[in-house]
Amino acid sequence: MSSQTPVVTVDGPSGAGKGTLCMLLAKKLGFQLLDSGAIYRVLALAAIHHGVDTESEDALVPLATHLDVQFIAEGDLVKVILEGEDVSGELRKEETGMAASKVAALPRVREALLRRQRAFEAAPGLVADGRDMGTVVFPSAQAKIFLDASAEERANRRLKQLQDKGLDVRFADLLSEIQERDDRDRNRPVAPLRPAEDALVLDSTSMTIDEVVEKALQYIESKLAE
């Protein structure tokens, strides 16, 4: 068995179920959790809280370097704790999203956040949720999973989520949005969405979440025992 801190990466397209899988894996393994998709929103929110200009690299880099954030799996949700405060609700606000877009466009800030994400690698272990965790952020991770599902299945899942919230949405619109996002993610010049060469590819299209978790755990346990 390797003496290094165990790292499990889960990458994949939007709507494949990465968040749910990572939360359940972190709880079952007793590992820490990193939601890389939320990290830019967290930094943007920290900037807003501290009155820092979200377009100033010089001001944002030290904030990113020392970002005090935790992701805690609790019940069916992941709580985001920024500087000791639960900011899960604030992260979803439009103001935070707009600020995050500005922050994400700054190269030195991206580099600082890359280092900050790598600092999550600590005992007893880490489950990292994202799009380039196994290819860019943690290329030496012992267990890498690429969780996929058909665009149609992901649109169906999203449709059900939104309908459960009482929203009136069309399947065709959701499918189109997902296909466009897939195209952007897979063809972007920096860190395109793709499985790491040594990743287990899981297609969850016709699998239940319990089946996905079982397959993932079998794979992780075998990799960590090597």
From Swiss-Prot:
Report whether Cytoplasm shows up as a keyword of the record: yes
Q: Which UniProt keywords apply?
A: ATP-binding, Cytoplasm, Kinase, Nucleotide-binding, Transferase
What are the recorded Gene Ontology BP terms? nucleobase-containing small molecule interconversion; pyrimidine nucleotide metabolic process
User: Kind of enzyme, top EC level?
Assistant: transferase
The UniProt record lists the keyword Transferase: yes
The reaction(s) catalysed by this protein are: CMP + ATP = CDP + ADP; dCMP + ATP = dCDP + ADP
Residues binding ATP, per UniProt: 12-20
Residues in a coiled coil are none
Tell me which GO cellular component terms the UniProt record holds: cytosol
Intracellular or extracellular location(s) = Cytoplasm
Just give the chief location class: cytoplasm
Cite the EC number. 2.7.4.25
Which residue ranges does UniProt annotate as crossing the membrane? none
Q: Which GO terms describe its molecular function?
A: ATP binding; CMP kinase activity; dCMP kinase activity
Q: In which family does this protein belong, per the annotation?
A: Belongs to the cytidylate kinase family. Type 1 subfamily.
PANTHER family from the xrefs? CYTIDYLATE KINASE, CYTIDYLATE KINASE/PANTOATE-BETA-ALANINE LIGASE
- State the protein's name: Cytidylate kinase
Lineage here is:
Bacteria, Pseudomonadati, Pseudomonadota, Gammaproteobacteria, Vibrionales
Identify the gene encoding this protein: cmk
